[in-house]
Amino acid sequence: ARHIRKTISIVGERIHHELNGVSCIGIEEVKNKKNIISSKSFGRKVMLVSELEEAVSNYVVRACEKLRAQGSRAQGLYVFLRTSPFVDPEKRYSNGMSTFFSIPTSNTSKIVKEAKHLTRKLFVYGYEYQKIGVMLLDITDAENEQYSFYEYENYDQSDRVMEVLDGVNSRYGSSTLTLGAQGIKKDWRMKSERKSAAYTTNMLQIPVVK
């Protein structure tokens, strides 16, 4: 061990001990995120509020998947949108709004509804929008929360629905089951013609040997 320390360092010596069954490297637990952001620039300029609502719904879905994956619920939501910062000053617009839920939630449908409401309030006609995004705020651990009987029943039913949704999408590929608010065409997205196939997350894209 001393020879290892001289030639590699004390870190190398610790690794040597670990490989020989002597625990000397502490395990640090990965903490859950307190805020979760989901956002991406559009593939083209967007001027319709309906397309902004569709985009924000998709970003909420992704954020909620991450939220439930770490066993958490969000107490609030922040939505922001903006034009390109490089256009003429009179054509620039950037704004954001937040809202807080009466009780913490991880229900995608509920958060999508609030996100669309905030998007409509933020939207100003005439601008060419380049980006919209969401942030889930004040995230809490679902296991540590206390509920009334009424709240528990609602949570139980909501959790079962979300569990089925996540289970199907995890097994058969992302977006196998989607909300109507997410739209179908989604031509506001970044162009993905050069995007690699999702071999590890979408069964339909697994190559077939003939």
PLM segments and residue spans:
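DNA-contacting surface of Y-family translesion DNA polymerases
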Residues: 1-126
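Acidic, metal-coordinating catalytic segment for phosphate/diphosphate chemistry
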Residues: 101-210
